[in-house]
Regions:
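N-terminal flexible segment immediately upstream of the FAD-binding catalytic core
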Residues: 1-66, 82-111, 259, 263-267, ...
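C-terminal substrate-recognition/cap domain of FAD-linked oxidoreductases
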Residues: 30, 239-395
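Glycine-rich, charged/polar anion/phosphate-binding loops
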Residues: 37-38, 159-163, 191-198, 208-212, ...
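FAD-binding subdomain of flavoenzyme oxidoreductases
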Residues: 106, 121-122, 126-246, 252
Length: 395
């Protein structure tokens, strides 16, 4: 690949740092999960950075940004590349700033953690749970592979949003430390109203180098699957449980048939094609309340609970069937699947879902996540599965 003089000069100035020379590694680090969208796949698949550099601390981040600014080289921030909107793609080549070495938990105590952006979500929990008995309030379904910086910079909510709402809501981020890209980079700290300027900004207006986030008490969550052949009953199951004041949940997902049978390999032997599925994570001290609620709703079937089951093979973590993992599992079976992102607000969320079902019968497969909305009421985030045909039809 022929590189511009600007890129060559920037690479030379940064050669004492961890600069990657292998093209396969550069190409890999240049990509996020944009390929979830067939529209983005055709537009972004060819994009690749000119070089990749991995800073080990904030001082090196400042040096990289200063050098790239001086040489007019574009910078794209990389956590783990699991975002699926194409928001972290090197549109103009340039430098990918990979934060994998900045992966330390700096401090944790009950209720809060201070952490570097390259720390994996699972590693934040792995550190905090034994150290202070608390865990992240919410995380993406890519908990095992995504970074905390990428989640805050590119995510909006996820597992835990049924209780805590979205990341943008007051109290779900405490503080962000950011380095700007300019002739003399500045180190800025954002709190309160200012947080919205840099959270969910994809690293486009500054590089997050430190995060302070709230934690919640950690539990050995019980992972459960419930089925019903009646769509309204399945949808209402997640809705009602999310509104039960005494039952603590981490996730409440609803999957319209035939999702479980067609796309969830380890669940498929235990469901019929007509079964709608509800995925739940229930706090252990809430199980008695949950089972009492189920007994009042005898038409719902508890087919799996992680603490007491006879399945030949564990289905794994229930949240790895929810949020964007639903689409990922469907894509493994049918590469033409994509999804639509919809928000169904309280109090009309169930009616609006059914209007959508009625408007596109047989064309859309509903996938809902119960979330606490801005007003504290429970509604649904929709990640509706759809088979891609044409861009016109998708629009």
């Amino acid at each position: 690949m022929i590189q511009s003089a600007n890129v060559v000069d920037a690479k030379l100035a940064l050669s004492h740092l961890d600069v990657e020379e292998k093209q396969t590694a550069i190409t890999s680090a240049s990509r996020d999960f944009f390929w979830y969208s067939p529209v983005l796949k055709s537009r972004l698949d060819h994009l690749v950075a000119d070089f990749l550099v991995r800073p080990k601390d904030e001082a090196e981040v400042i040096e990289i940004l200063k050098v790239c600014y001086a040489n007019d080289v574009a910078v794209t921030t990389r956590g783990a590349g699991t975002g699926n909107y194409g928001q972290a793609m090197p549109m103009r080549g340039g430098c990918v700033l990979h934060l994998k070495h900045m992966d330390k938990v700096i401090h944790c105590e009950p209720g809060r953690v201070i952490v570097q952006p390259g720390c994996l979500l699972k590693d934040v929990d792995a550190y905090c749970i034994p150290a202070c008995g608390h865990e992240l309030r919410m995380f993406s379904s890519t908990w095992a592979t995504a970074t905390i910086g990428g989640f805050i910079a590119g995510g909006s909510g996820g597992v835990g949003s049924v209780t805590w709402g979205s990341l943008r809501e007051l109290g779900n981020i405490i503080r962000l430390r950011v380095v700007t890209m300019e002739q003399e980079p500045r180190v800025l700290e954002f709190t309160g109203e200012e947080l919205a300027r840099v959270s969910h900004a994809y690293g486009t207006n500054g590089i997050i180098t430190e995060l302070e986030l709230p934690l919640a008490p950690a539990y050995n969550w019980i992972h459960c699957f419930v089925t019903s052949k009646d769509w309204d009953r399945a949808m209402n199951c997640a809705d009602e449980l999310a509104n039960e004041n005494g039952i603590l949940l981490k996730i409440a997902s609803v999957y319209e048939s035939p999702t479980a049978k067609s796309y969830f390999q380890r669940v498929a032997p235990y469901v019929d094609k007509e079964d709608h599925l509800v995925g739940l994570m229930v706090a252990p001290h809430s199980m008695e309340g949950f089972l009492t609620w189920l007994n009042r709703n005898s038409d719902l079937n508890l087919i799996y609970r992680s603490d007491n089951h006879n399945w030949d093979r564990s289905p794994g973590l229930v949240f790895e069937y929810g949020w964007n993992h639903t689409t990922l599992r469907a894509l493994k079976v049918d590469p033409n699947i994509t999804y639509l992102q919809v928000r169904y607000g309280f109090p009309d969320h169930q009616r609006l879902v059914n209007e959508m079902r009625g408007a596109f019968p047989g064309e859309l497969i509903q996938h809902l996540e119960a979330i606490r909305m801005d007003d504290g009421k429970v509604g649904f985030a929709g990640l509706t599965l759809v088979k891609f045909t044409t861009e016109k039809r998708l629009d």
